Design a protein with these regions (language model features):
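Periplasmic-binding protein-like
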Residues: 83-89, 135-136, 194-201
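Hydrophobic alpha-helical segments within soluble ligand-binding/sensing domains
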Residues: 70-71, 75, 115-130, 226-238, ...
Length: 267
């Protein structure tokens, strides 16, 4: 064995020295991880994923079932990583299960982490952008769409226009093309009473059309994935200025994902 030898090594601080972010992704989601890879190309930010079992068909009944599996999904993100923030990636799930319940289940496994979900992130984004009257676009059934609209209205964000696709199959949601989404955003957001648009659902591919839609409308556009990425960065202590400086090292331009990325957390 004289040709085999033990070699010396040293350790450094590892990945995620700017921020360690955890993400709980639905089993059926085709989009969230891909869009986060685009939006979190920031030097020193590490993002780790766990998957949670869910039904392909999106109904209030199937959504509420996820709260049983949420602790296991959170547990698969190792506590030893000392996450700064963890996001549960389902807007409709957070609506039906409840934002506080989602946070409680994740915090039971990661008590020192900040927690978010796309619904909570949307509310924070509306506060940061000072949006009070929004148009809402969803792929959901009328029942799930109404539950989300009611939740936003109850939080003080008036939903003045609503459009939905009525798709219960999450696989199909992930295949809705960019032109369909762009045209829907413009049609809803063009109404004068709307000061912005929220596109709900982590499966919808919105990230790469946000900038174009904002230019067309002259109004902010928020998506579930964009809001969640922004909120998790801010909760992790990555300010707008820091994110811009760190992203320049990787050649990324965060402004391409909307005006939201220029905003701090609301007070």
């Amino acid at each position: 064995m004289d040709h085999v030898q033990q070699l010396p090594y040293s350790n450094d601080a590892g990945l995620g020295q700017t921020a360690k972010i955890g993400l709980i992704v639905l089993q059926t989601d085709q989009t969230l991880e891909d869009e986060f890879r685009q939006m979190l190309v920031i030097d020193g930010v590490a993002c780790y994923h766990s998957r949670i079992a869910n039904a392909m068909h999106v109904t209030p009944q199937t959504l509420v079932q996820m709260q049983t599996d949420l602790p296991l999904a959170a547990r698969l993100l190792p506590q030893a990583f000392a996450f700064d923030a963890i996001g549960y990636g389902c807007t409709s799930g957070a609506t039906i299960i409840g934002e506080a319940q989602v946070a409680q289940l994740i915090l039971a496994e990661h008590p020192s982490a900040k927690v978010s979900n796309p619904l909570t992130a949307c509310k924070a984004a509306c506060g940061a952008l000072k949006l009070n009257n929004i148009a809402l676009l969803t792929p959901y059934s009328p029942h799930v769409t109404q539950a989300l609209s009611d939740n936003l209205n109850a939080s003080g964000i008036k939903v003045c226009r609503t459009g939905y696709y009525d798709i219960e199959d999450d696989f199909t949601v992930g295949r809705v093309d960019a032109n369909s989404i762009f045209n829907a955003i413009v049609a809803l957001g063009a109404h004068a009473e709307c000061d912005g648009v929220f596109v709900s659902c982590t499966s919808l591919r919105v990230a790469n059309i946000i900038h174009r839609a904002e230019q067309k409308l002259g109004k902010p556009v928020i998506s579930s994935n964009q809001a969640l990425a922004w909120h998790l960065l801010r909760l992790s202590g990555v300010s707008h200025k820091s994110a811009q400086e760190l992203s320049q090292k990787t050649g990324q331009k965060l402004g391409q994902f909307g005006t939201l990325f220029n905003q701090p957390l609301p007070n």
